[in-house]
Amino acid sequence: SPANSVWS
């Protein structure tokens, strides 16, 4: 996953 993606 890209480092700038945020996951809940």
UniProtKB/Swiss-Prot annotation:
The modification D-valine is found at residue 6. Expressed by the venom duct. One of its GO terms (cellular component) is extracellular region. One of its GO terms (molecular function) is toxin activity. Keywords: D-amino acid, Hydroxylation, Neurotoxin, Secreted, Toxin. Occurs in 2 forms which differ in the post-translational modification of Val-6. In the form conophan mus-V, Val-6 is D-valine. In the form gamma-hydroxyconophan mus-V*, Val-6 is D-4-hydroxyvaline. Both diastereomeric forms of D-hydroxyvaline may be produced. The modification D-4-hydroxyvaline is found at residue 6. It is found in: Secreted. Signal peptide: none annotated. Belongs to the conophan family. The mature peptide does not contain cysteine residue. May act as a neurotoxin. This is Conophan mus-V.
